[in-house]
Regions:
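Short glycine-rich loop/turn motifs
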Residues: 36-38, 149, 158-161
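ATP-dependent phospho-/nucleotidyl transfer catalytic cores
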Residues: 48-154, 166
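"Short basic amphipathic alpha-helical interaction patches in structured regions
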Residues: 1, 41, 54-57
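Catalytic activation segment of kinase domains across protein kinase-like and atypical kinase folds
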Residues: 159-176
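Residues forming well-ordered secondary-structure scaffolds
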Residues: 6, 20, 36-39, 58-61, ...
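Short pocket-lining segment of the protein kinase catalytic domain that shapes the ATP-binding cleft
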Residues: 39-46
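Generic enzyme active-site microenvironment
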Residues: 40, 154, 172
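Conserved NTP-binding catalytic cores of kinases and kinase-like/nucleotidyltransferase enzymes
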Residues: 1-36, 145, 152, 165-170
Length: 176
């Protein structure tokens, strides 16, 4: 549920200060008790937006557009003192909702997923590492990331969370 809260807060609190291609939100709300949320945003079809297939291809112009938006996002918040103020609600590699999930039931959830999926088990075999080794490496990597300069990340950047606008532009959806 906290990912939904992050998305609501992005559109409500941060969207207006960024000059990037992402939908305009007209209203958003998150109910902490139920985990339910809602966002009323512009109808991107009114701008002839297309939604690419997650396994499809993008043009060089579209990729350049997306990378430009990500660079703008990262530069805007790079080492911002706001992370200790009005942005203290944002997660870091070693704090916040996803960290808390991983440190709580996360390892057991991953174990259950491995038990259910032969494909996922095969990935461990191909890596030549046990789950416990990878778990230790994950937390080592998280500590390294946490010691680096902070900025705001999209949180789930992949083709399925993008849209394409006429003229070679591309935008970002699904802010976690």
């Amino acid at each position: 549920a906290t990912m939904y809260q992050n998305e609501v807060r992005f559109y409500r609190d941060l969207r207006s200060e960024l000059d990037i291609e992402t939908p305009q939100a007209y209203a958003s709300s998150f109910d902490a008790a139920s985990g339910r949320f809602g966002i009323v945003m512009e109808d991107l079809r009114q701008r002839s937006a297309r939604f690419p297939n997650a396994t499809g291809a993008m043009s060089e112009a579209e990729i350049t557009s997306l990378l430009g938006h990500l660079a703008t996002l990262h530069a805007h918040f790079w080492e911002s003192p706001r992370f200790s103020g009005d942005l203290a609600w944002l997660w870091s590699p070693c704090s916040g909702g996803f960290h808390d999930f991983l440190r709580g039931p996360g390892l057991e959830v991953i174990r259950q997923q491995l038990e259910k999926s032969e494909y996922k088990r095969s990935l461990l075999v191909r890596l030549g590492r046990s789950l416990e080794e990878l778990w230790t490496l994950l937390w080592r990597a998280q500590a390294i990331l946490d010691s680096q300069p902070r900025t705001l990340l999209h949180g789930d950047t992949h083709l399925g969370n993008t849209y394409l606008v006429p003229g070679g532009g591309a935008g970002l959806l699904d802010w976690q």
